[in-house]
Amino acid sequence: MPSEAVLGQELLDERRTETRRYKLRFPTREALEASLAIEAVGGAVAVALPERRVISLDVPAAQVSFMAESFEAARQHYGAEIVEDYRYSLEQLDFYNPLAFAPEGEAQQSLDDVIEAIGAPQAWSHSRGEGVVIAIVDTGIDGLRPEFPHYKRHPRSWAANGEDPWTDWQGHGSMCAAIAAGTRSQGGEFDGVAPDAMIMSCRTHFYDTELAAIYDELTSLAREGATVIASNSFGVQSGSPPPVPADSDFIPALDDAIAAGVIVCFSAGNYHHLAGGTPDGHEPNSIWLHKGRSDLLTVGAAKPDGSMWYYSSRGPGQFPGQPLTSPKPDLVGITPPFGRVVYGSNVSVLKDGWGTSGCCPQAAGLIALLQSKRHAEDEPPLSRDQLFDVIRKSSVSLGHHGHSQGAGRLDCEAAVNRI
């Protein structure tokens, strides 16, 4: 297994076994600010959301019992409500397992082949993503990789307190960033779908409060006039419908970002087989929670030969027919078996492809191409609904049920030519 994956597993294990994350919600912002003294008695503030009256604390396992008194004081003196901070799962295909990786010599296709297959090079004569920000909400991005030169890094990239957004604790975020918007311009091995787009690294361990802080920042950028696209490859790893997370700050922050004009893409999930689905089947549903919303784009995974991956989550979504939902997935990207791609600080070969995680940033890159073309032509950006309509109508059907492929495989050239 590549060293970054080993390191990522070690860091994840350390976080799970040595710390716990708690969310404290206060009745007023003043109460929150007055309570921050509790940090000195065992808990370190990971995220502060003053406007939402919330902080989250990392508490070492050995200190949890000692923090009980401080938590009780926060309840009594400041009116705090205290719960464990909900954590989503990284959308990954057991990338911690050495068997998920293959030797370099076994590579069948690479990111270059995928970029060609989805028509990105043909679209570059019209647009390469300039003037658009793609936020990669993931495990961070390895700033040592030449695909991510300094001139492409957004200055408001985000990480929790004490962390660097341009480091990658697992490798997954670097993969997604390279697919969406990597560049060869400074010696990188690959171009992504939108090689001239700005990249905003949003490094997270997928806690609710971290995601809320990220989306609050994206909201601010959009309100300031930036064209922002968010690529998200996290969810709930389950073969059955999960309960809706209680007391979420992420979902209201997501609502605010979408209302401000942030265009949001999500991986459909890698759970079809966990739900008991067969490789060729289009049921049962395994697209969970907010990924069924009509105001975001949900992306599944197909192989280069047009067949569906056995793991790609099928629709129509957890809450079909309810208000503000639509049948999912919206479309699919391509990920090859034994596919060669950036992963952390290395270029690695992944036996079962890159998951729906590797397809979501393809869609984010396509949206960047579309919005960048509008900008270059001095035209206003397309609305969310216009973008989604163009992308769906230009997609190429692979002959599968809509619950598997949505509208089909994205086609960058056809989409750019459609506007």
Predicted regions and their residues:
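Autoinhibitory propeptides
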Residues: 3-4, 12, 32-114, 121-122, ...
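Extracellular S/T/G-rich loop segment that most often corresponds to the catalytic His/Ser-adjacent loop
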Residues: 138-140, 146, 286-372
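Short glycine-/aliphatic-rich beta-strand segments at the starts of folded cytosolic domains
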Residues: 8-26
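Anion (oxyanion) recognition and catalysis
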Residues: 39, 76, 128, 255-259, ...
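Active-site-proximal beta-strand/loop segments in catalytic clefts of secreted hydrolases
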Residues: 26-27, 85-86, 137-140, 179-183, ...
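Subtilisin-like serine protease catalytic core
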Residues: 122-155, 163-210, 225-227, 259, ...
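Hydrolase catalytic cores
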Residues: 180, 200-204, 335-405
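Substrate-binding/access-modulating region of protease and related hydrolase catalytic domains
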Residues: 183, 202-295, 326, 345-361, ...
